[in-house]
Structure formats: C-alpha cells, structure tokens
Amino acid sequence: HKPGGGGAVAWSEFQRTAKPDGYSIIGFNIPHIIGQPMLRKDAGYETDGFKPIMWFHFTPNVLVVSKDSEFKTLEDFINFAKKKPFVGTVGGSGTYSANHLETIRLMKAAGIDLTYVPYTGTGPVIPALMGGHIKAAMSYSPVSVNYKDKFRTLAVAADERVAALPDVPTFKELGYDIVGGAFRGVAAPIGTPQAVVDKLAEAFTEANKQISKKQLDLGFVMKYSTGDEAPMLIDQMREAYGDVLGDIKNKK
C-alpha cells in the first residue's frame, strides 16, 4: 500500500518495478490516471502503462449542501452563482480529481463561476461543509447515502438515478449534460499474458458479484468491464474529459 499523490506514488512505483507474472496487481481509477499524466510533468507514470483487468464499479459525483442551506435545488445554487460570481465555494477531494473536473464541467454547462476548494481527501470535506466553511461540495454518491441526515443532494452526475438515492435527480434531468465520477478497477503490469489477465478477471467478477448488493446500498453503480472493453473505457473517458483537461492545460 503506497498512499500519496492521489495514487501517483503507487502507480509510478508499480510501473517501474512490478513484474508481469500475474501476482502483481494494483487498484486504479479514472479520471486520475488520465488527468495526472496530462497535467503534471512529474506524475511518474503513463496512462497507457497499465494492462486493465477489470473495472468493477462507478462512483458518481454528487453536488451536496448542508440540510440547513438556503439552496433547496440545483437551480437555487446556479442562480446564486450567476448573481455572485466566485462567491459560491465548492469543496472537493484533491486537484484535477473527479470532483474538481466535475466542478469545472458544471461551471461550463451552467455558465457560472465558482471557487473550487481542494481538500486532501473526501474526509476533510465533510466537516468543512458541516461547519459552513464552504457553500457546497462536489463529492461522491456514498457521501449522500452516509450523510443523508446532514446533507441535501442537489444532483447526481449519472446517466440515471442511483438506486440508493431514488429521490435525487440527475444533472441530465435538470438540463445539464454532466455525467462523471470515479471508475474504479484493477490492473496488471504491461506484458502480463492475456490468459493470465482473463483468469484474474474471472476471479474478480465472481468476487464482485458477492458484494454487489452492499455496493449498491452504499450508492455505487455497478459497471463491469473486462476483456477488450476494459482498455476501451480509458479511451472513452479520455475523450469525454478531453475538453476540460485541455482547457486546464492551456491555462497553466
């Protein structure tokens, strides 16, 4: 386990030292593995330096406010931001993370200016929102489930409503074509034989079935992707986030 750098510490060491023998595997996620190498010269790893085994779930972004917030709906929040540019503070986990990129996409889609406040992880965002230090948070769907008595979720960035949050509208329903979050999976080193990768994918698929009900209850969306589809997801999301990442890169 190698924490740090939003995954970059572990991923860079993995790509440098892991052997393609079927015994070296690592957890990874989108958009981190796309955004970091594109925006940071010192990321230490390459997006295409992994051999995906399986993507096992999707964690949609959610825009949440405290229960006593003046914002009852997404439109309330957007109207406030239009009247007071940059006054609307949105906390999130990290820089160039799924939370950060979704905040930028919301600004572009709604024509508003917000101030994104990066925290070291999801954990510190929660007391910041509870304490009124930020107006809202762009976080992940399990936060909406776990803190439903403390927070109001204005919208979820999924194609359809999340099973554990049936009363929360999607951004799409509200007129904003925003779908995003963190896709999580496991990968092997480049050079690992495909037969080995397929065998590992079978094992992970079976294990994931055993815990899928728990994941759904926590607010995750089950998205299985193995075989040829696994690397295709990276290409699809690289294209989906291309405009936002390109804008950030050009401004640096």
Annotate the PLM regions.
Residues 9-20, 82, 104-109, 123-137, ...:
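Short helices/loops that flank or line small-molecule/ion binding pockets
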Residues 16-24, 37-120, 124, 181-214:
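Hinge/capping helix and adjacent helix->loop/strand transition within the periplasmic-binding protein
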Residues 24-26, 62, 135-136, 153:
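Short, Asp-centered acidic motifs that coordinate Mg2+ and/or phosphate
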Residues 27-28, 119, 138-139, 156, ...:
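Short beta-strand and adjacent tight-turn residues that come in two discontinuous sequence segments
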Residues 31-41, 105-109, 131, 136-166, ...:
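A ligand-binding cleft/hinge motif common to bilobed small-molecule-binding domains
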Residues 58, 142-207, 236-239:
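C-terminal lobe and pocket-closing loops
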Residues 108, 112, 194-252:
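An extracytoplasmic/periplasmic, membrane-proximal ligand-sensing/linker region
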